[in-house]
Amino acid sequence: MSLGLNVLVLGYYVLKPEVNKLVLKRKETAAKKETANLFDEINPVKGFTINAKYENLGPKMISSGVIDLDKFKQTYEKSSQPLTKEQLEILTKGSDKKIKIDRDNSYFLLNFFWAVGLNNKSKVLDEGDIVKYGEGKVGNFASTGGWSLSKTQPMDYYAKSELIPMIAEQESLVQKVDSNIYRPCCDNSTAFPDCNHGMALLAVLQLMAANNATEK
């Protein structure tokens, strides 16, 4: 083997780890960029507005007890994201503003709508998959037993309050749509709201249906 070839071979083995690192780094950079682009698509900086208002959902939930205001506030204070003046008003006074979802309020809305979904009386909770798969122990799911911001035990509020009045057609629309929306965290449809994201999304669908949203 010639000296030149030896040098090339030696150089290959010496540089191979660094080359591999460089290739891996480029792949990781590309993957991160792709993830960032996807995140921007599903959670844009400008946010997006849905055709529904908060109205008196907040006061209703505080009145029912599914939200203990002190516990709710403390949760956000502990995470260094204290509730804003507007968020406190949504909870205590209600709001006629349309609901805008953005990066700044997504954590607030997750818990807000989790409570709505848990407390709102609906066929999904009374007769749906969560009852079927719960086998008499519906309170064992993360979306039910995992709710810790209520006055008493979470199942005391399960499907107990008519927070979002819906006519039969609107409830049927929710049941039609929720079975086709799957969550990447657990690969279950919203028709089976066994986690907090599923319960929150169920509430959003119910609120939109009550505001005459269509399937499209």
Locate the predicted segments by residue.
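Intrinsically disordered, low-complexity segments enriched in small/polar residues
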Residues: 10-11, 52
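Hydrophobic membrane-insertion alpha-helices, especially the h-region
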Residues: 1-10
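Acidic/His-rich structured neighborhood in mature extracellular/periplasmic domains
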Residues: 37-199, 214-215
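Short glycine/serine- and small hydrophobic-enriched flexible loop segments
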Residues: 202-210
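Ser/Thr/Pro/Gly-rich low-complexity linker/stalk segments immediately outside membranes or between
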Residues: 15-35
